[in-house]
Amino acid sequence: ARNTKGLGDFETVFSFEHLYAAYRASVKGVGWKASTQRYKASALANIDKTHNALLGGTFKSKGFYEFDIVERGKPRHIRSVHISERVVQRCLCDYSLVPMLSRSFIYDNGASLQGKGYDFAVRRVTRFLTKHYRQHGREGYALVFDFSKYFDTAQHAPVFRAIEKSGIDDRLVALSEYFIKCFGDEGLGLGSQVSQIAAIALPNKIDHYIKDVLRMKFYERYMDDGLIISRSKEKLRECLAALRRLCAEHGIKLNEK
């Protein structure tokens, strides 16, 4: 397990060295953008200004760039943050939120953290299907589910509770919640790294209930899509009832189609 010392301390997380590393990571692959080039031209001065604003409690968001994409057949509205804020969010996520929140994630939470992602989820589902076939042949069923308008309707309160219980200090909690509140009273932004980890974490208790309480070994979730494989249709009906109840408790809309 990763040593969590310093991951919950605001000043340690936002050291100049961490901010510089976050800057280097944030500009990879987007160096062609004019806004990125302007930021890079005075990178050290910009990082120093951000560092002082964070430690002085005066850091503010600069708003969003908005555009639309289609991802895995689903239209997505993106509200991308300014490069200076992307550096801060990268630093916050890499050196605090991701390691602190992901400690409690199930292995089969396949969303795009280090070593995970869409290909990981596909490999796991393929493995589940292979193992099920070896054990039961063609006898079995799959419950496929997804969360309706997940990023648009995600409720903040359960996310805030998870962040507050993660072991980080009050200033890190406040900054994390500030970034999420920038998107309004509900919903999470697809162009925000803090929102991404929040979206991954929000159904964590649902994952644990399906895996640990209902003991469904062949369960995989990739962000707002999930799959459960079982020999028993009745067991999957029990899983569906649990999903409906738990989603309602967490402010998540289960797609009933």
Sequence positions of predicted segments:
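Active-site-proximal segment of RNA-dependent polymerases
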Residues: 5-9, 93-145, 149-152
